Every structure is written in structure tokens, then in C-alpha cells.
């Protein structure tokens, strides 16, 4: 690894890779062991439910006719490029922002892979209480949400991001 990568936030790409492996492995396990729309209750408020999401969060645009696959893929590619660029400019010591960008990057790439390979995103984590159901999601979605929460945390508590000069 180059000296620049050792000093920049790019060293945090290990976190993205780890989350990508967990996301891919969990989706592979669900697809290989469950039928589409099958649900396995694990707790009174939690089940594994295999579904396809053709849209974005909360199935937004899922009935848009197919163009959304490429539109959402283009957005994910652009955001991923931007996140890598930001990581390159951040010092590796800026742990909160580096972790946040790496988590969002992992989620974007994890869902991008599904969208390009299959035309939909594989979701399976189902949380509910009585008749109230949260939309089914996946590990990539968790990474994006945790990354976004870290970005908010940093916005309220962190210092201004300092650019790394090579």
C-alpha cells in the first residue's frame, strides 16, 4: 500500500470490504436456503423474510417500469466515487468520518451489486411489532444507516474535516 493510502482515510476501506463480505454472504445464505417470500420467525418482533426490492428505500420507485434500476445504479456509482475521493482527502485519524464514509460506501456497493446483477436488491431483515411492519432491509442498508448516523454525530460534535495534504 502506498504512503498516501497509509496516511489517508483510504486505510479505512478495510471496513467497507468487511461489510461487503458480510452483506454478500448473508444474501447468499438467504437466497440459497429460502424460497422467495418465505419467512422464518426468530423472535416475536423479528424474522428473516426473503424479498426483492426493485426500488430504493421503502420500495420507492419500485413500480417505475425498470428505468429506476439504472438511475439508482448511476447514483450509487457517483456516490461511491465521491466517498472514495473524500476518504483519500481525509486523514486516517479522523475516525468518525472515515468510518461513516466507509460504511455508506459498503452499503452503496452492496446494493449496487444486487441491482446490476439481478435487477433488484435482496432484502431479508424484517422487524415488526403486532401489525406495524418496518420495510424489509439488508446488511447494506444497515451500513448506510449507521454511516449516516455517524455523519450526523460528527456534524454535531466533531471538528471541521481537515483535508490531508500529500
Swiss-Prot record:
Membrane-traversing stretches: 11-31, 42-62, 67-87, 90-110, 133-153
Primary enzyme class: hydrolase
Location(s), subcellular: Cell inner membrane
Pathway participation: Protein modification; lipoprotein biosynthesis (signal peptide cleavage)
Cited HAMAP family: LspA (MF_00161)
Keyword hit for Membrane: yes
GO terms under biological process: proteolysis
Function: This protein specifically catalyzes the removal of signal peptides from prolipoproteins.
Recorded topology in the membrane: Multi-pass membrane protein
Known catalytic reactions: Release of signal peptides from bacterial membrane prolipoproteins. Hydrolyzes -Xaa-Yaa-Zaa-|-(S,diacylglyceryl)Cys-, in which Xaa is hydrophobic (preferably Leu), and Yaa (Ala or Ser) and Zaa (Gly or Ala) have small, neutral side chains
Active-site residues, record numbering mapped to chain: 123, 141
Segments forming a coiled coil: none
The protein's Enzyme Commission number: 3.4.23.36
GO molecular function terms attached to this record: aspartic-type endopeptidase activity
PROSITE patterns the record matches: SPASE_II (PS00855)
Organism ancestry: Bacteria, Pseudomonadati, Pseudomonadota, Gammaproteobacteria, Alteromonadales
Protein family per UniProt: Belongs to the peptidase A8 family.
Keywords: Aspartyl protease, Cell inner membrane, Cell membrane, Hydrolase, Membrane, Protease, Transmembrane, Transmembrane helix
UniProt protein name: Lipoprotein signal peptidase
Gene Ontology terms: cellular component: plasma membrane
InterPro entries to which the protein is assigned, alphabetical: Peptidase_A8 (IPR001872)
A Pfam family recorded for this sequence: Peptidase_A8
